[in-house]
Amino acid sequence: MVAGMVVIPGAAVKADDKKLIGVTMPTKDLQRWNQDGENMKKELEAAGYEVDLQYASNDVSTQVSQLENQVANGCDLLVVASIDGSSLGEPLKQAKEAGIPVISYDRLLMNSDAVTYYATFDNYKVGQKQGEYLVDALDLDNQDGPFNIELFTGDPGDNNCNFFFGGAMDVLQKYIDEGKLVVKSGQTE
C-alpha cells in the first residue's frame, strides 16, 4: 500500500521540494487506526515525504473540515480512511478540481469520481474467516445444535460490511439450512 503511494506519477520527491501527503483516519479510539496512521506516516516520511496525519474522532464534519484544510494547504496526495464513505463529496470534489490524487484506504469512498486508487483488504475473505471462526467455536461439524445466532452487517455507510456479510453467510448458510444455526429474527439478507 505505502509502496504504491511512493511511485504515484506527479508525486515524485525532490530533495529540495518535499511533497505533502494528507492522511485522514476516522478515529484514535481503535488501535487499528492508530497503527495504520502512524505506520503510514513513518513509512512515507522515511521515503522523503512530509505527512499531515489527522484523526477525525468519528465525526464526519470534522473529517470534511480536515480534508478541506488539506486541499487548501496544498497537499499533493490525499489518503482517506472515511467514517462514512458517502459523505465526503464536497472535499473530494475540491481535491479533484485541484488535481490532487485521492487514495481511498480500506473503506471505499462512494458517490464520487475523485478516487484515484482504492487500497483495501479482501473483505469477502475477512467475512469468510469470521464465519469459519463461528463454525470452529461452536464445533458445528460435530455438534447437533441448534444454536441461536443473530447477524449484524454493520454501518450502511461502510461499503465493506456487505462483503463481510456475504463471506460469512457463504460459510454459515449451510448450517442455517441444516438447522444447526437458527436465526430467530429470520433476517439473513
List the model feature ranges, each with a label:
Residues 1-6:
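Bacterial N-terminal signal peptides
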Residues 7-189:
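A residue-level marker of the well-folded mature domains of exported/periplasmic proteins
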